[in-house]
Regions:
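Conserved glycine-rich cofactor-binding loop
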Residues: 5, 12-13
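Rossmann-fold cofactor-recognition segment
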Residues: 44-56
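A glycine-rich helix->loop->beta "capping" turn
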Residues: 64-77, 83
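Substrate-binding pocket helix/loop in short-chain dehydrogenase/reductase
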Residues: 86-87, 94-96
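Active-site helix of classical SDR
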Residues: 110, 146
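Residue(s) in the substrate-gating loop at a strand-loop-helix junction
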Residues: 130
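C-terminal beta-strand-loop-alpha-helix "lid" module of Rossmann-like NAD(P)-dependent dehydrogenases
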Residues: 162-210
């Protein structure tokens, strides 16, 4: 892949860090986005100062990559964050901030690189989604909603640009060994009725991530999505992630609903326990300016 140029957002840790290293290892010239000049980047990665929430920043960053490298072959939309709490507990400001990063950040980046890719008549855009992009997520409902939106965007984009030589693909990690939960923002308007369930849910999430796989497995899926002659629309990643994806898509809705509620203990007075799917979202986000944590 010598000569190929990639942009990866959110490379300071987790999936973004592993992805940048994997692409460098495959011969890509990798530009990693960072909001600060002090951010430590993976070895072999070139820094581009860029904030996915800021259109002017993105335009300047993409222009810099084109000036330095002359082309863009791959965009990995990885930067993201999360808010932990029930839907009722999450403020509208937090919801807007989260969508501004997880959804609109990826959309801004995508729109910024597409003119160059169209001119080349080639390119690949990989979206880091999550199993929660097509599963319900008690106490991470806004995160799940942002990933559901991202999945719709990515699939639509792939159909729009395919005849132009540009492909889009989704990588859907399960639970991974990252700092994702510890860096999540807590919902702003906590309600006592949810406390036991919320706390227990977070504890189960932490237990699942402690025994989960390394983000390197996600990086390998990104490389496959980036280099395959005929990329798949989706790449579930993690222990049993493919099985969970299949159950979600092929079981009757009422049957899946019952299985899901049983796995989460949602019909009991006690707190729900996250299902042990080997999945979840990754990428260590850093503190955002307002409500969400961003990478």
């Amino acid at each position: 892949m010598d000569g190929r140029v990639a942009i990866v957002t959110g490379v300071s840790s987790g999936i973004g860090n592993a992805t940048a290293r994997a692409l460098v290892g495959r011969g890509y010239r990798v530009f990693g986005t960072a909001r600060s000049a002090a951010t430590v980047l993976p070895a072999g990665t070139e820094r581009v100062l860029l904030d996915v929430r800021d259109e002017a920043s993105i335009e300047a960053g993409v222009a810099e990559v084109l000036a330095r490298a002359g082309r863009i072959d791959l965009l990995v939309n990885n930067a993201g964050g999360s808010v932990v709490g029930a839907v009722e507990e999450t403020s509208l400001e937090q919801a807007r901030d989260l969508f501004d990063v997880n959804f609109f950040g990826a959309m801004r980046m995508t729109q910024a690189v597409l003119p160059a890719m169209r001119a080349q008549r080639s390119g690949r855009i990989v979206f880091i989604s999550s199993l929660l992009g097509f599963l319900p997520a008690p106490f991470a409902g806004l995160y799940s909603a942002s990933k559901h939106a991202l999945e719709g965007l990515a699939e639509s984009l792939d159909h729009e640009t395919r005849t132009l030589g540009i492909r889009a693909a989704l990588v859907e990690p399960g639970f991974m060994r990252t700092n994702f939960d510890s860096n999540a923002t807590l919902a702003a308007n906590l309600v006592g009725d949810y406390q036991q369930a919320r706390d227990h849910s977070r504890e189960n999430f932490r237990k699942n991530t402690e025994g989960a796989e390394d983000p390197q497995v996600v990086a390998e899926a990104v490389v496959e999505a980036a280099t395959a002659a005929k990329p798949r629309p989706r790449y579930p990643v993690g222990k049993r992630s493919g099985l969970v994806a299949g159950l979600r898509r092929y079981l009757p809705a009422a049957v899946f609903d019952g299985v899901f509620r049983k796995q989460f203990d949602l019909d009991f007075t006690g707190a729900p326990a996250l299902p042990r799917t080997g999945g979840g979202r990754t990428a260590k986000p850093s503190t955002g300016e307002r409500g969400a944590k961003v990478a």
